[in-house]
Amino acid sequence: MFKFLKKIFNSSKKALRKARVIANKVQNLTETMSLLKDQDFVVKTNELKQRYQKGETLNQLLPEAYALVREATKRVTGLTPYYVQILGAIILHQGNIAEMKTGEGKTLTAIMPAYLNALSGDPVHIVTVNEYLAKREFEGKIGEVFLFLGLSVGINIKDNNTEEKQKAYLCDVLYTTNSELGFDYLRDNMEIDANNLVMKRPYSYAIIDEVDSILIDEARTPLIISQSAKETKNLYKEANRFVKTLKSKHYLIELESKTIELTEEGINKAESFFQIKNLYDVQHSSLLHHIKNALKAFFTMHKNKDYLVNQNQVLIIDQFTGRVLKGRQFSDGLHQALEAKEGVLIKEETSIGATITYQNFFRLYHKLSGMTGTAKTEEDEFRDIYNMEVIEIPTNLPMIRVDEPDFIFVTIQEKYDALIKTTLERHKLGQPILIGTTTVEVSEIISKKLAKNFIKHEILNAKNHFKEAEIIAKAGLKNSVTIATNMAGRGTDIRLGEGVADLGGLAVLGTERHESRRIDNQLRGRAGRQGDPGYSRFFISSEDELAQRFGGKRIEKIISLLQQINTSGKETSSKMVTNFFTKIQKKVESSNFDYRKYLLKYDDILRIQREIIYDQRKGILNSPHPEKIALNLMEKTINQAVVPFFTNTKKTNQPEELILFLEKSFFPKGTFDLKEVQAIFEQSPNTALTEFRKYLSNKMTVILEQQKDSFEKENNDINFFDQVIRWFMLKIIDNYYKRHINDMSVLRQGVGFVGYGQQDSFIEYQKEGQILFNKMVDQIVMDITTAILRFPLPQSFQTPPQQEKMILNDNNSDNNITKRRRKVRISKKPWN
């Protein structure tokens, strides 16, 4: 293990050493670039593009390109990127993660690799965690730098309409958010008109700001486009009413994993309450699902920590950023269970229409890189999942922040008292203070305690996130006290006011350790930017959630130790206790990493299926002649279906049975002539099958040509039939695929997904998922064939959207998936 870590460490040093050689070449061109006139920069960009087209690589162009960007940045913004920013930019171009501390200038750093990679003609996406940051860069001086260099730059945000998005995606460099990118991808793959597609260029290169937040913290949160599901509001209310009657003996909570189940007594109580014999009978599966959600809502989800209630709505709080997740809902009915718990309006439950995780979305890019101040603790995950190394970039000026050892207490109350005392002492000196909390609830507790001591302060949490920029702008001024959840202005520097450096800079006080050391480091990183002085210290207790949930039996020994060394409730430091908390964090980080890897294994099954479906959709959507695709599908389907009828061509009634089968399954009645079919059956089986297939192909071609002529004459549009065929095929695919996604979700639960870590459950999911997928593909092809061959006459045909009901009538989706078993057929390209 030590050898492996040493190898990784040496690899990072080696990468930085190589980057220095390149950075020196960039610096050596500083004087040359300073001689250029403003109008020369566009000319120089065109020259670099031509050199790339003639065969020079981006690596060969890098020194000149970066030097050009440095000079352009200086002229437009008045700021010259430091040497360390050049190092970071080189690491980004190499497809790795540049770990740059707060205030080291990640924004300027990103311009260089974005410019260089845009010279290839492929788009570059600079991805931020929120629209505020994307707008700031696009609308400010940063966007002007790209224009000065002769590149186009765009912005893609939620409020953009289709035309605005299309223009933005055509730009050389695009500023956008991770969520908008993902949703655009899903929406494009649900589109039925190619003219409305917004992402028409390849996924070439992405630079992700706050990369750990997006690829680690949000990795377990899928992007979902949902649609209305069945109405079940009464069940949520009934389950909520039942759970309110429970006592501790009726349920069992596993604190570490936050899972909850009914005990035997709880099951008996449920069966009595709902007047049923067996709660686990298949007919009560929906009721059981609602009870489980109600249990989670009541006993594992906490108001002002996991969610908040505002204007009669339940709003999710992001556990890593502290922000409200606008427009998001907890999935699988949990959100509705929380609404029932809080007595607010229960929204319509939704089912999944399309979904993708950030893990799989960003792996669509040919090259991926990222920036953050805190990635080193997660470098194994970045390497294993995304094939990116984390390279620590040195600071431009030495880091002089003082990070004091944790203050440790037995009780939370003792901890809060000491925190307030420290705040009072430093506030009297005029030193600005940032108090970091893990939840909205704790931030409000601290606020009340400060108010009792007449300390004027600002509070920044999910309830008033709209004031974030204003609060952060003042957080570094003399006498300011700011309480913040871990949203704490990430992406925005806290600048010190006049005279604050002499007072020791910003003091950061943490109210408890987070599950991840990385989040702790982010809080510390608010102080000590760009060589400024600063101070940080965490206040922790044995009653903190981290210790209670993950401490296990050792927590009792820790409490005993604390009581021995601290009999007065005063602050104390203990290396042993600090190490105990650090070990817990490492354990949780490792467990979360394992869980994300396990989730990815499951999601990769969906990814393969999704890519097959989306590839087929694109072929149909972009084809100038979709009727040819339809004819090919129809021929394959029917040709396969008729094979059993040709095993014995001498059977006297075989032609009649074949015609009956075809006209019942696919064709309109009266399509076939019995004498023509009988004549074919007079030949040998193999010859007869070959001839009949030709006969069928001719029939289908004639039907399509007749339909095409009729549709085009009726609507006076030579392209109308193509549009109708395309619409029918896409709608059939979409309706079945939406159902398939939800079936896969049911399957995931059915194979015991909650008990992850058992290889058997994954193999079962993989096998049954393939069966479901094959069945879906068969149904899609059958429906396309039948729908097209039985098209209504033109005079009765309405515009495509009004025909949706005639496409899919089979609503008998089999939810008892795990009981089915059959041989697995591997489908990679099912329709080709």
Swiss-Prot record:
Location of the protein in the cell: Cell membrane; Cytoplasm
Cytoplasm recorded as keyword: yes
A Pfam family annotated for this UniProt entry: SecA_PP_bind
Enzyme Commission no: 7.4.2.8
GO function terms (MF aspect): ATP binding; protein-exporting ATPase activity
Annotated region described as Disordered, given as residue ranges: 801-832
Catalytic activity of the protein: ATP + H2O + cellular proteinSide 1 = ADP + phosphate + cellular proteinSide 2
Annotated membrane topology: Peripheral membrane protein
Main location: membrane
Domain of life, source organism: Bacteria
Binding site for ATP: Q85, G103, E104, G105, K106, T107, D493
Record keywords, A-Z: ATP-binding, Cell membrane, Cytoplasm, Membrane, Nucleotide-binding, Protein transport, Translocase, Translocation, Transport
EC class: translocase
BP GO terms, sorted: intracellular protein transmembrane transport; protein import; protein targeting; protein transport by the Sec complex
Gene Ontology, cellular component aspect: cell envelope Sec protein transport complex; cytosol; plasma membrane
Assembly description: Monomer and homodimer. Part of the essential Sec protein translocation apparatus which comprises SecA, SecYEG and auxiliary proteins SecDF. Other proteins may also be involved.
Family that this chain belongs to: Belongs to the SecA family.
NCBIfam families: PRK09200.1, secA
Role, per record: Part of the Sec protein translocase complex. Interacts with the SecYEG preprotein conducting channel. Has a central role in coupling the hydrolysis of ATP to the transfer of proteins into and across the cell membrane, serving as an ATP-driven molecular motor driving the stepwise translocation of polypeptide chains across the membrane.
UniProt protein name: Protein translocase subunit SecA
Gene designation: secA
